[in-house]
UniProtKB/Swiss-Prot annotation:
Protein name: NAD(P)H-quinone oxidoreductase subunit 5, chloroplastic
Database matches in Pfam families: Proton_antipo_C, Proton_antipo_M, Proton_antipo_N
Gene this chain is encoded by: ndhF
Broad class of where this protein is predominantly found: plastid
Job of this protein: NDH shuttles electrons from NAD(P)H:plastoquinone, via FMN and iron-sulfur (Fe-S) centers, to quinones in the photosynthetic chain and possibly in a chloroplast respiratory chain. The immediate electron acceptor for the enzyme in this species is believed to be plastoquinone. Couples the redox reaction to proton translocation, and thus conserves the redox energy in a proton gradient.
Amino acid sequence: MEQTYQYAWIIPFLPLPVPMLIGLGLLLFPTATKSLRRMWAFQSVLLLSIVMIFSMNLSIQQINSSSVYQYVWSWIINNDFSLEFGYLIDPLTSIMSILITTVGIMVLIYSDNYMSHDHGYLRFFAYMSFFSTSMLGLVTSSNLIQIYIFWELVGMCSYLLIGFWFTRPVAAKACQKAFVTNRVGDFGLLLGILGFYWITGSFEFRDLFQILNNLISNNEVNFVFVTLCAILLFAGAIAKSAQFPLHVWLPDAMEGPTPISALIHAATMVAAGIFPVARLMPLFIVIPHIMNFISLIGIITVFFGATLALAQKDIKRGLAYSTMSQLGYMMLALGMGSYRSALFHLITHAYSKALLFLGSGSVIHSMETLVGYCPKKSQNMVLMGGLTKHVPITKNSFLLGTLSLCGIPPLACFWSKDEILNDSWLYSPIFAIIAWSTAGLTAFYMCRIYLLTFEGHLNVHFQNYSGKRTTPLYSISLWGKEGSKISNKNFRLVTLLKMKKNGRPSFFSNKVYKMDENVINLIQPFLSIPNFGNTKTYLYPYESDNTMLFPILILILFTLFVGFLGIPFNQDVDILSKWLTPSINLLHQNSNNSIDWYEFCKDAVFSVSIAFFGIFIAFFLYKPVYSSFQNLDLINSFVKMGPKRIFSDKIKNAIYDWSYNRGYVDAFYGTFLTAGVRKLAEFTHFFDRRIIDGIPNGVGFLSFFVAEVIKSVGGGRISSYLFFYFSYVSIFLLIYYFLNL
């Protein structure tokens, strides 16, 4: 056991050789390195698998045992200041290490096929391996300085991966936005770290908690300053976990490849956002106001993220806002002091969300054969629908992930979310009402995403790519508040082009196909991808390859069974409680971590009823019951029937506007913050050029002018000098005379 802990420092550095060797290989032997590129994927998976096995071994040893701090080396700046580096192995570290490695392995295996066509394949795996190193280093850190170092490396890797396709202007802007927004939180984190070092004189967690507790209990510290430093520390977590109001980078981050979206939402945002708050819980608990502030930010984010997800057209952005809301639940639980519930939901949500993102990637991958390699088309749920027959494995896996996130038993998120919802009643009835209402919204928007993606008919054959509706019937999620336009009954279907290798588009003749006893006239969507030698033609999407389906199937198992780790029927079965011993729980301080069947069933029936209500509303609005009507037009909502529908239309349009405009937060920042900073910069530039530079420039110009005048006067004649001399004397005498009158 001691030997295992002795070598635990190697955990973050095991994946590091891959990016280093890829970089050296591309620099010294580029052709050979590129030709053996699949080998690097295998090495990435192998090294991360070793880390996973090592982490699991540590986790087993951590059950009912104390945490281990190991000093490695120190960097001595001077006699009074030195930085110590080591690692901390405790239940929190074990949980995060297993989560990062398991999700990371699934994403790497998935990416091997998903990114196989991409010229940046090697670069992607180099970034991913370095990303894993950064996250593992973050969760094993023993002090605030190490956390900050690896925190910045996580931010750098996020920047590189979000902007992976940097030749696309949208992706380049997205990674810049993510970088700048996170810099706000990072600056707050740095100030908070320096503030607590000034108070306690230590960066080490164990010393920091003990010293601060003694200072506060003896009333030897400025409480306002301590609270300010704690808020600054929390600001870093707000930015990294996309909590309100520093969440604006999250939807734009979907411009990166789908596998990295899965890793960011399942592992990174909890490793770099929720983890620091959980790690610093002993510090925050002695500052009651900061706990209230954490729970307030959490409940705002819970509701805000759910409302923004209600009418998204992009499948990945809908899931992104879902992550924002679910991380809000975790932050709410931490703010309430329900440490176990927060970490339980962290685990269950991670695997469910990874399953959903990899499932969405499979859908996007299959849609690209029809609409081309353009995210605005392949990720647009307007063009999806009817995929059940074409991608059945992806459909079933996505359905399981959806039901898990909705809170349907016995799937993973049901067990963890229920604990948070029940604890919220003990903390604040107002917060509880918001949290329970948002649970219904979660079921609604997740079921909506599923229905628009997999049910009905494939809409790419019936809608143009601009998303304009072709009938006077509409849905708030698809067509928004656009005015009704009566379309021509003999409308022409979307024209699909084939891009030849010479880049010239060519039209293909119409052919008649039979779908569900309805004869429709389609243009066969032959597609060939330039430079990849693809000669296959596709009329419908097809299921992904086994390399992509294998991680999805493994994540299905996690989604089905990981929730049983924390079922609190009795203390012997509750593995999670044993794992987290000792655990912080301010709401159940005298609890023995077990509940009776009656209490559990009563709470479960209520939460499941709310989830089913949200699912029912989604089916009522988005189930395409009219899809067999003329032209197989997709109708997801009600038929307009005159003035009675005006009020409901306004509500739908308001919801759509709120979601489409991202809650107007981006517009607010653009109007007041960005525009204000630009005006301040313009004023500063004017003041600097005209005032600061103007004064010395003016003095110089005046001196030059006076010198030129004097120069022109001096002609070398004594009579001229005498004339000017007596003239000036006379002027001064007159001035003196008038002043003494």
